[in-house]
Amino acid sequence: MKFTLSWLKDHLETDASLDEICDKLTAIGLEVGHVDDRSSLKGFVIAKVLKAMKHPDADKLQILLVDTGSGTPVQVICGAPNARVGLVGVLALPGTYVPGLDVTLSVGKIRGVESFGMMCSQAELELSNEHDGIIELPEDAPIGGLFATYAGLDDPVIDLSLTPNRSDCTGVHGIARDLAAAGIGRLRKLSLPKFVSSFETPLRVFLDFSQDASLCLGFAWREVRNIQNGVSPQWMQQRLSAIGLRPMNALVDMSNYISFDVGRPLHVFDADKIKGDLRVRRGREGEQLQALNGKIYNLSVKDCVIADEEGVVSIAGIMGGERTSCDEMTRRVIIESALWDARSIAQTGRALGLVSDARYRFERGVDPAFMETGLEVATELVLRLCGGEGSKTKIVGYQQPEIKQIAFPFSEIKRLTHLEIEREQVITILTNLGFGIEGEGNVVTVKVPTWRPDIAGKADLVEEVMRIYGLDKIEPIPLEGFAEAKGQVLTCTQIRSRVTRLALVDRGMREAVTWSFISESQAIAFGGGQAQLKLVNPIAADMSVMRPSLLPGLLIAAQRNADRGFPDLALFEVSNIYEDDTPEKQQSVAGGIRRGTERFEGAGRFWDGHTRTVDVFEAKADALAVLEACGLDIDKVQIEVGAPDWYHPGRSGVMKLGSKIIVGFFGVLHPAILERLDVSGPLCGFEIFLDRIPESKKKATKSRSPLKLSPFQMVRRDFAFVVDKVITSSLIVRAASGADKKLIHSVRVFDVFEDLSLGEDKKSVAIEVAIQPIERTLTDGDIEALASKVVENVTKATGAYLRR
């Protein structure tokens, strides 16, 4: 929100300096983003060229004698092609700082001829990039006068960074109101004209809505005829130019000016270009509008528009159309002042990519009680600038806004701020801000002004009082000290999340944080997409459903890195997934993926040439590392087939505890899933459900039991079993381990062999059993007895026989 200092003083009677005003604005919550005081232009004067002579030693230079109003001509050397006798321009005298050159002028010689100043271009004054010639001013410009004053460039421009809730400060009058309440001057009341009109406009306006009446809560219009649309006055042009708007003509400039002056967006139609009646309605598929910015916009049924019998003439509340725009030939206009739905304006603006000052104000909310008054202000300004006569005002669809009332106990200020503020001071602050106060005692009724839609409750009123009283007066209060917590502070899930992160980082993986919402197609591919998990207002079309798995986000992140030259990587995330919208179905999960050659041992090419890509075993090892870090005995984990469809059916597994508890999945990602997500492999991944891991029954302790190592040598024996192909290796390992849990240290598969010589649908699985004596060295008989027990257990569990 930009405005000039003189503009502010039209609404605020004050002697405060620019610095005092800016400091107070920031203090009351209206942050000053930038101030352009343009003090660097104060030393430039208006001068007229009296004489122009060719430089004796330079073909492209001239010796100018210029009149500065002092009575004594000044000699200046100039190389501008447009320098000539009679030209009125801008002169910088010695001692003047030239911002475009970043130099301070002094008397100097150019090719042997002294120069006592410099005729300036727009680029040298940083007014534009134009540097081909010096500035040319009208002949009636005051010779010797200050250029900054003449051009209106001595008026500081203040730029506020408004928060979205302060719609009341999108006009200079609202800003002045806040400053007056804060003690910076006195608020000047708006001059609200009233007209006695002699005729009625024949134009009719219809609100063509069925159940969408909230799209337009009121539409007021008035016709003004017999006007002359010329240029706007210089003071208005200077103010509009200062805030970055290009002056066009009196009618356009008037509507822009009122939008910034009192925060009331308007639109002016050329009445002779309107065909028939106006209708406010939804857009229609295939409709287009060439807007005032020259661009053509394709409209839809989601857009609110104003249309006549020939089609759309305006995108409601955002921008008008070229067909009904006003020009120098306009003689009859319709001034429109309406109330548009903030949400509809915001949605249409985003969909069309159309930004305007009107949209900026309507999507934040304008004062509903100022709709007709704003029309009166606009009419008065049109009559003053363009002449003519106005019709009676017509209004459709408007109802007086209901005044919001809040029961406000003065004790609420002490409760929220720990400050004691006098009752009368609180009432004065709220009254100066436009609030109405009724009642006596410690609880009063506060009537919220219609221009403050952001005030909803008692806390908002406390905030209003405090930002005017002074937020800096709130003394810091140290946090209350608490005794040291006894017992476990972190929850089980928090502890598991922490140790999981450490374990996966130790395995060379990098943590990622991805969005909790993904596209509907991705969610369906990973078993989700339920209706109750769809977002009502997604931030993007491809982020519309809560994720059922961590893998989609990690896969997209991996592909994004691969596209940027990092194909080998390992990512993990510890976060939540969602099965439905109940708290019980929000699960804490650790998920990870590896891509390319990013194995635990490293990535990329090796000197021996044996570069291997990631496979199911990397994913399995990562998953087991998580389970082990969470305190689970991984020897109890059963690995079976039957992973979800997004895994490769022959290169994946399910991790179970017993027959029912599934604690995770791992494997190579299915090629069809990768193609569906437009992701390239090789890729493997895992998912561990942290909430499903049983809590350890061991009592937590900071001390560790001493390491006990056996002094006896470990014995290893190999066994090769012939089993059916459907038998998993994990079943054989568990059966062998159960032969003697005290002596058997580990069981490991080291070979799988398939051949017709073994029989149809048969395979050979070779295991190594490590036997660790504890109390004494085992005899051959002990070892043979244990070996027989191993064979017996495996045969009983799987139907295998020992391969000879």
From Swiss-Prot:
Q: Which GO terms describe its cellular component?
A: phenylalanine-tRNA ligase complex
Q: Which residues form the FDX-ACB domain?
A: 710-803
Assembly and interaction partners: Tetramer of two alpha and two beta subunits.
A single GO BP term for this record reads: phenylalanyl-tRNA aminoacylation
Query: What reaction does this catalyse?
Result: tRNA(Phe) + L-phenylalanine + ATP = L-phenylalanyl-tRNA(Phe) + AMP + diphosphate + H(+)
Q: Which UniProt keywords apply?
A: Aminoacyl-tRNA synthetase, ATP-binding, Cytoplasm, Ligase, Magnesium, Metal-binding, Nucleotide-binding, Protein biosynthesis, RNA-binding, tRNA-binding
Question: By what name is this protein known?
Answer: Phenylalanine--tRNA ligase beta subunit
The family classification in the record reads: Belongs to the phenylalanyl-tRNA synthetase beta subunit family. Type 1 subfamily.
The protein's matches in CDD domains, at most eight in alphabetical order, are given as:
PheRS_beta_core (cd00769), tRNA_bind_bactPheRS (cd02796)
